[in-house]
């Protein structure tokens, strides 16, 4: 079987983890690599030609449409950019089926879990039985999504998060590193949970909650609007 030719969107920190996952998959059987990593696309002009874990930034994201034999995965998501993930995916201008799901070999995904297109699950993370993860989700290292929990499309889960059972995280939400989400809580669409939070009550759509226990932050304490 020929290797899958793949391009990562974005040259930031999350892309390092995704490239690491691709390289780790290739290292399982070096004589028959799973992926051919073509390079990286990024919209920051200063990044053109830069190497990211040895892989060149080839051009802007709009160039994806010119790479007709490649698959893609999005690596762009930070507190500054996470709400633009749907726009970034659209800007690539390629069919939905050309987005690759990337799972690090040291991640664990239950056979009964469902994981969508274009989603990345990085090293040490666990997706438990009957969990559902949507399209274009980024799950960073050592994060656990427990049974029957649902992660909406375009959401970002940072490193070291514990999502307990029956949690519902909405589309385009962002959960900061080291947080714990108690069973059955809901984090609404485009909401933010600050790093290190303990969420024991629902977080409404578009709101920012942080702390232990997590409480809503007034707008004067964040710059996300």
Put a short name on every predicted segment.
Residues 3-23:
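Glycine-rich adenosine-cofactor-binding loop
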Residues 18-19, 50, 83-85, 203, ...:
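Short glycine-/acidic-enriched loop or helix-start segments at secondary-structure transitions
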Residues 22-26, 89-91, 225:
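Short, solvent-exposed amphipathic alpha-helical segments in soluble enzyme
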Residues 27-49:
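NAD(P)-binding Rossmann-fold cofactor-contacting core
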Residues 45-108:
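Phosphate-bearing ligand-interacting subdomains
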Residues 101-217:
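Structural signal for interior beta-strand "rungs" in well-ordered beta-sheet cores
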């Amino acid at each position: 079987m020929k290797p899958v030719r793949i391009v990562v969107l974005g040259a930031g920190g999350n892309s390092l983890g995704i490239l690491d996952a691709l390289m780790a998959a290739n290292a399982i059987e070096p004589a028959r690599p799973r992926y051919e990593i073509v390079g990286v696309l990024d919209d920051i002009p200063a990044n053109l030609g830069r190497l990211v874990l040895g892989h060149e930034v080839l051009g802007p994201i709009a160039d994806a449409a010119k790479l007709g034999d490649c698959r893609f995965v999005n690596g762009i998501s930070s507190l500054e950019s996470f709400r633009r993930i749907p726009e970034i995916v659209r800007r690539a201008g390629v069919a939905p089926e050309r987005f690759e799901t990337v799972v690090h070999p040291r991640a664990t995904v239950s056979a009964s879990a469902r994981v969508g297109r274009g989603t990345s699950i990085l090293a040490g993370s666990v997706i438990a039985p009957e969990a559902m993860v949507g399209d274009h989700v980024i799950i960073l290292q050592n994060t656990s999504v427990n049974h029957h929990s649902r992660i909406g499309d375009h959401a970002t889960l940072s490193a070291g998060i514990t999502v307990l059972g029956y949690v519902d995280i909405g589309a385009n939400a962002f959960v900061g590193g080291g947080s714990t989400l108690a069973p059955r809580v809901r984090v609404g669409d485009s909401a933010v949970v600050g790093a290190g939070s303990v969420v024991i009550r629902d977080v409404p759509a578009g709101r920012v909650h942080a702390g232990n226990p997590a409480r809503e932050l007034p707008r004067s304490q964040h710059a996300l609007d």
